[in-house]
Amino acid sequence: FLDECKEINKNENFKEIVIDKSDNPAKIKKEFFKESEIDKIVEEYNDENVIALKIPLNLKKIFDNEEKKEEEIIDIRSYFKVFLKKTEYGMGMDDVIRGPMPVSDLRTLDKSDTLGLVLIEDKPALEFFRKAESANHRLFEKTEELKNSYDKFGHQLLLLKSSIAAIKNIISDKDIEVSDDATKDWFSFGT
């Protein structure tokens, strides 16, 4: 799985999620995809191919403007990457990697049927999440350094923390929808 992720990352072969908002949502939603895109993601996932998504981030960085003697907020666009792959039930696991560092307490797929990786390597995102990282490198939280450096950062933290589970839920919901449609002709009571 990791070798496949490295290859995809090297070739920049990602599906970019388009979020039509100036601020970040707190989680990835089905509405961010066309129905055909969800169908393609589900098909790729069920064929045990790696799903690779680039998730946009809108960061509001605080700068001290020496000339005006005041703080300014500058909008910065960045992103992080999410990889998912179906595996045998019970063999699932995931990790969040910020630069060279794993952030261990954000794991959500242990013992599931999915392998996952969140990769933070774009420079603005690296800086943002480094400032949000706890001293023991185990989670992202509202640190003093983050509060002093960024404005409106809560949704960015939630977006990353929930990204793997949200994408997995979109896939699972579509699988359930397909499964329900497949059996409705056999079990149509009173319709």
Feature map (PLM): residue ranges:
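Bergerat-fold GHKL/Histidine-kinase-like ATPase
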Residues: 1-191
